[in-house]
Regions:
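A general structural signal for well-ordered alpha-helical segments in protein cores
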Residues: 30, 62, 66, 91, ...
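Glycine-rich phosphate-binding "P-loop"
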Residues: 141-145, 166-167, 268, 274
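Catalytic alpha/beta core domains of metabolic enzymes, predominantly
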Residues: 129-133, 144-249
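Active-site beta->alpha loop and helix N-cap motifs at the rims of alpha/beta catalytic domains
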Residues: 2-151, 302
């Protein structure tokens, strides 16, 4: 049975494959990819996160991806599903769909479409309503870059978590190690998991009490936890450099997955299938070249690690 609180480690936010001719979901490639990721040393999968282009998917497609993931990874592998939307009602619909499709946790962005109207009381009321009605444990997703600049501070997150036992964690894509420190010092890890949202501050977060990261590079976590700090730091520095070109937009993120993890999963024509969904463009040749360079360096370091 999957624990109520997400377990420490690396949770991978999976990208979404599309049929390049029809711009519809390629569920066969998706299933193969999910199965590969589940075998690669991860703690769990995140379906329908930012990298999955969740806001470009229909409600039916979102449910299809979660169900495909559950089929691919079996009944016991942990799945966290993104359920971000603009209203409380929409979020609750997505949560119920996720529960039916087999998710174990839901990852919830704050409402943000009307930025100036999204006041602290609105945010607190939103998470109160969602957590009370959700059949699944809730993980707060703090990502100012996709939320009109709305940034939940550690006091607000603590207040929400203490009031709502069904809020069991947070993903911080705000790059604040200080926020990780304060939350880890305030909320017991048995009741609340604090995850970083980018690989480039993974070790910084671990050193002050984070549970891990919702990003790539599971081997950095394992090396650090095994006490191989120098090796972990060497790979971590390269991973941090890789974050910049690979995270400059969804197009480069998906291209990096196409030439690295999708290739390892044995998925044919991955570059075509991992183009961003329309109307967004694929990466430029210059961007591709930079991604290839940094990913080759990371792969070389990985190959030399014992």
């Amino acid at each position: 049975m999957v624990p109520r609180v997400p377990q420490p480690g690396i949770w991978c936010p999976a990208v979404t494959f599309f049929d390049p001719k029809t711009d519809t979901l390629d569920l066969a490639s998706q299933e193969r990819y999910y199965a590969y990721l589940a075998r690669s040393g991860l703690t769990g999968l995140v379906i329908l996160g930012t990298n999955a282009e969740a806001f470009l998917l229909t409600r039916e497609e979102r449910a299809q991806l979660i169900a495909t993931a559950r089929k691919a990874v079996g009944p016991d592998f942990p799945i966290m599903a993104g359920v971000g939307a603009h209203s409380t009602r929409q979020v609750l619909e997505h949560i119920n769909d996720a529960s039916t499709a087999g998710a174990n946790y839901v990852l919830v962005l704050p409402p943000a479409y009307f930025g100036k109207a999204t006041t602290p009381p609105v945010i607190k009321s939103f998470f109160d309503d969602v957590s009370c009605q959700s059949p699944l444990p809730v993980v707060i997703y703090n990502f100012p870059g996709v939320c009109n600049g709305i940034d939940l501070d550690s006091d607000m997150i603590t207040t929400i978590a203490r009031k709502n036992p069904n809020v069991v964690g947070v993903k911080l894509t705000c790059a604040s190690v200080g926020k990780i420190t304060r939350l880890a010092a305030t909320l017991p890890p048995a009741e609340f998991s604090v995850f970083g949202g980018q690989s480039d501050f993974l070790i910084g977060g671990l050193s002050v009490g984070s549970a891990g990261c919702i990003a790539a590079f599971a081997n950095i976590y394992e090396l650090y936890k095994a006490g191989k700090v120098d090796q972990a730091m060497e790979l971590h520095r390269k991973a941090a450099l890789a974050e910049s070109p690979c995270k400059s937009g969804i197009a480069t993120t998906k291209y990096a997955a196409a030439i690295f993890s999708a290739k390892a999963a044995g998925i044919e024509d991955a570059e075509e299938k991992l183009r961003p969904r329309k109307p967004y463009d694929p990466p430029s040749e210059a961007a591709k070249q930079e991604v290839r360079k940094v990913m080759a360096e990371v792969a070389a370091i990985e190959a030399g690690l014992s």
